């Protein structure tokens, strides 16, 4: 929305909005009554060009740490399938013939790796092949 901040603030005040600050950025939402702890699984395999990745300014994403930006968005415009672990992009994935190839951007705890393994098994009934970055 290309409107002055004062005008946007007045509009937000008319809505039943809640807000929170992450870093130095304020985010607004309308409560939907869902229990957030139940709403998102520990591991989510997002598709390439998923709206969760495209719906935010890349540099301001709540889900994609800035240091992993090029691991998901390449300079040619490709958006790789992202692996979300506990609400943050932890790597990317690709379905291969016999396994799900997972490339991590950092380390995961044993509990987090188990969530990835369970997620791949539930979605594809295939094992995970851990790839180097």
Model-derived regions: residue spans:
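Long, charged, low-complexity, helical-prone intrinsically disordered regions
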Residues: 1-133
């Amino acid at each position: 929305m290309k409107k002055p901040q004062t005008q946007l603030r007045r509009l937000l005040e008319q809505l039943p909005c809640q807000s929170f600050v992450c870093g130095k950025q304020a985010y607004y939402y309308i409560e939907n009554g869902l229990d957030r702890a139940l709403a998102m699984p520990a591991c989510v395999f997002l598709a390439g060009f998923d709206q969760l990745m495209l719906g935010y300014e890349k540099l301001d994403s709540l889900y994609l740490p800035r240091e992993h930006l090029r691991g998901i968005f390449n300079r040619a415009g490709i958006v790789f399938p992202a692996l979300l672990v506990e609400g943050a992009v932890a790597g990317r994935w690709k379905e291969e013939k016999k396994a799900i190839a997972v490339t991590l951007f950092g380390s995961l705890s044993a509990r987090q790796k188990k969530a990835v393994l369970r997620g791949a098994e539930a979605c594809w009934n295939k094992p995970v092949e851990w790839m180097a970055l």
